[in-house]
């Protein structure tokens, strides 16, 4: 039986998880669980969580979710947030205080898609 060599590239080894749901159960039982495992288990070299839409408000109100995100950040997950969404909910400053990279996300997400980065949406 032959051995297949797999050569990874930056885009093959990058995962972007777009989290838009305001449902804390979706965050805990799907979004955060997979995102954190992907980084801890080295399924991807780079893992980024993008906070977009109603999730921006939820994360500023839920201490349990905040701790889970801090744990992910500690383990190397990068966290970005949509500035327009954060401003809609009045939480941009809070997200920045949590260490999130709060910025306009339309162009970066489009760039991720064009470059072939793996993207999941919850």
Q: Which stretches of residues belong to each language-model region?
A:
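A short aromatic-anchored loop/beta-hairpin motif
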Residues: 71, 80, 96-111, 117-118
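A glycine-rich helix N-cap at a beta->alpha junction
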Residues: 63-92
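Aromatic- and Gly/Pro-rich donor/ligand-binding loops
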Residues: 120-122
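N-terminal beta1-alpha1-beta2 submodule of the flavodoxin-like/Rossmannoid cofactor-binding fold
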Residues: 4, 11, 49, 57-61
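Short internal beta-strands
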Residues: 35, 46-52, 79-85
């Amino acid at each position: 039986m032959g051995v297949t060599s797999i050569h990874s590239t930056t885009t093959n080894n990058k995962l972007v998880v777009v989290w838009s749901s305001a449902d804390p159960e979706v965050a805990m039982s799907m979004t955060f669980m997979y995102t954190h495992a992907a980084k801890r288990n080295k399924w991807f070299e780079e893992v980024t969580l993008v906070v977009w839409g109603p999730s921006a408000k939820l994360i500023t109100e839920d201490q349990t979710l905040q701790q889970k995100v801090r744990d992910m950040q500690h383990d190397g997950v990068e966290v970005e947030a949509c500035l327009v969404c954060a401003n809609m909910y009045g939480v941009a400053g809070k997200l920045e205080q949590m260490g999130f990279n709060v910025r306009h996300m339309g162009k970066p997400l489009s760039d991720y898609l064009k470059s072939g980065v793996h993207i999941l949406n919850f």
